[in-house]
Design a protein with these regions (language model features):
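Conserved structured core elements
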Residues: 23, 27, 128, 299, ...
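Switch/coupling segment of Walker-type NTPase motor domains
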Residues: 49-51, 56-60, 75-80, 433-524
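An acidic- and aromatic-residue-enriched active-site/binding cleft used to recognize and process polar
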Residues: 16, 49-52, 92-94, 310, ...
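Hydrophobic alpha-helical scaffolding
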Residues: 117-120, 124, 274-277, 308, ...
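Beta-sheet entry/capping signal
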Residues: 8-10, 43-47, 86-88, 302-304, ...
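Glycine- and acidic
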Residues: 13-21, 116, 300-308, 412-420, ...
Length: 524
């Protein structure tokens, strides 16, 4: 995609499901991103754009073969709100000139917008080669899947909206309509929606340390950790309509360090006039020492959360929620009211080159990547066989295959299930739910019930099938369980039947450590 003098390659990103990644796996994902970013040429922009849209669950009650319980399940979750996550990755090749521009410059003011660097075929080919390497490195990690978007998926067709049109409409629907954009002194409005923007654009607003992942206290215990990425509070844990933009600007690393060396010398010369100059000089030297000691690459970074609502009162609550989530990351919440139009304009897919340089801060690739969200919401299994479960965060129903699909992917080697929990935690309730759906999909189910937990389910199935299925054998003193091993429907005793009777008699007659003699076997 060629947009505003820049070349952009767009991907749809499939991230791992939340609460399914360990700390070591988060490190592996972070390492894969870092390796991929390093293959990109200078003056590239890595823009990861995560959409989180509130939607309501639509029940599947139109199917004719639904049982009473399945239909009741669907009706119970009708209109259940949940957060739908869509992730895009945009790799943009810009120029040195555009990467340094401030917010007071826009390509809208230029007559000819394609610079000489982009017109060079060799530059374009090298960039496209590096994006292919980027895609391969990230895909080889085994945790993230990148799917390159086509031209129609970016710009849209007469019948379906592309990602650019969706961005202008603040929607992820394929059939959407463009909205009027209104800019006022105090706010920005798109259609009926009011926007609010929180930014991470200054190193002073950042925590003293960043990390790849952290402990999610609500689902962790003293003996086990539930891990989420460092930036997860701005992702699936923020339950409102919002876009989380993450930018990494790759400049000329050598030139950056030379500029910092010059600044350090200037600060040293002015240190006797101000203690602040001396402190700045020490910070710059620490940055340079880190870069030289560990071979780190100097980049610029920016993150922002763009949230919206059509209700002014709800928007106030959203502002507080975003600020609270930033505080959970130990970041200083900064509600930006001045640069909302500029940053919204720079967030258009393909327009990353128009990002205002003063809204970014210098860091290294590894630290910048810690601000990437690395998980998505739970997804339904593609397998036709499975059971209905619900998302533990929002309660949205999901179709999950916990037997065949994990076996096919090599996650498990058998289909055994071990259900563990204290008394009253719902073990029998879940098993009733599981075996009932397995039965409805044609599975033969045999249960040894020691507490009559499944008698009600069997009686219901027995009534539905007219006694064909749902047969329940139980023991009472008046009517103990008994069977005649010598009975056959046709009165014919084949070899298999005779062997089973022989085995039964030996089991009842002999002990485990008392093998039968040859004469006894012949007699039988």
């Amino acid at each position: 995609m060629l947009f505003r003098s820049d070349i952009t390659v767009a991907f749809r990103v499939e991230l791992p499901e939340l609460f399914t990644i360990t700390s070591a796996e988060y490190e592996a994902i972070h390492s894969a991103w870092a390796k991929a970013v390093k293959v990109l040429p200078n003056f590239c922009v890595v823009h990861k754009q995560d959409w989180f849209i509130r939607e309501n669950y639509t029940p599947e009650i139109q199917k004719d073969d639904l049982s009473f319980l399945s239909r009741s399940f669907e009706r119970h979750f009708n209109e259940r709100p949940y957060l739908n996550h869509t992730c895009y990755l945009l790799l943009t090749k810009t120029t040195k000139e555009r990467s340094r521009r401030q917010s007071d410059f826009s390509t809208l003011c230029r007559g000819f917008i394609v610079p000489k660097e982009i017109q060079d075929k060799e530059t374009a080919l090298k960039f496209l080669e590096s994006t292919s390497q980027f895609e391969r490195i990230v895909g080889d990690s085994g945790f993230i899947k990148l799917t390159r978007l086509t031209g129609d998926e970016i710009t849209g067709t007469p019948t379906q909206a592309g990602i650019i049109e969706k961005y202008f409409a603040l929607s992820q629907y394929y059939t959407t309509s463009l909205q009027d954009i209104s800019l006022a002194a105090a706010d920005m409005r798109i259609g009926d929606n009011l926007l609010c923007l929180h930014t991470l654009s200054d190193a002073e607003d950042l925590p003293s340390q960043v990390r790849t992942d952290g402990r999610y206290e609500k689902l962790s215990t003293d003996r086990s950790d539930c891990r989420l990425s460092f930036a997860s509070p701005l992702g699936v844990l923020l339950s409102c309509n919002h876009i989380y933009n993450q930018y990494i600007f790759i400049d000329d690393h050598t030139e950056n360090l030379q500029r910092f060396e010059k600044q350090a010398r200037n600060m040293h010369s002015l240190s006797r006039y101000s203690r602040g100059n001396q402190i700045n000089k020490e910070w710059i030297e620490k940055y340079l020492n880190e870069a030289h000691s560990y071979g780190l690459t100097s980049v610029r970074c920016h993150c922002n959360v763009m949230a919206w609502s059509d209700d002014a009162e709800e928007l106030k609550r959203i502002k507080n929620d975003v600020g609270s989530q930033l505080a959970l990351m130990e970041c200083k919440p900064r509600h930006n009211t001045v640069d909302t139009p500029t940053l919204y304009w720079a967030g258009i897919p393909g327009n990353e080159g128009d990002f205002p340089a003063e809204e970014s801060f210098y860091t290294f690739i590894e630290q910048a990547l810690c601000f990437f969200t690395e998980e998505t919401s739970y997804q339904s299994s593609p397998s036709p066989f499975g059971i209905k479960m619900v998302d533990r965060l929002t309660g949205k129903p999901l179709h999950l295959d916990i037997s065949d699909l994990p076996m096919k992917r090599g996650i498990i080697t058998n289909r055994n299930k071990f259900i563990l929990g204290p008394s009253g935690s719902g073990k029998s309730f879940f098993t009733n739910h599981m075996v009932r759906q397995y039965y409805e999909q044609g599975t033969h189910v045999l249960i040894v019930d020691t507490g009559n937990s499944y008698q009600g389910l069997c009686e219901m199935i027995n009534r539905m099938t007219g006694g064909k299925d749902g047969v329940y054998f139980t023991y009472t003193e008046e009517n103990p369980i008994a069977f005649n091993p010598f009975y056959t429907d046709d009165g014919v005793f084949d070899i298999e039947k005779r062997e089973s009777i022989k085995t039964l008699i030996l089991t009842l007659w002999k002990r485990d450590n008392e093998p039968p003699t040859r004469a006894e076997e012949v007699a039988l």
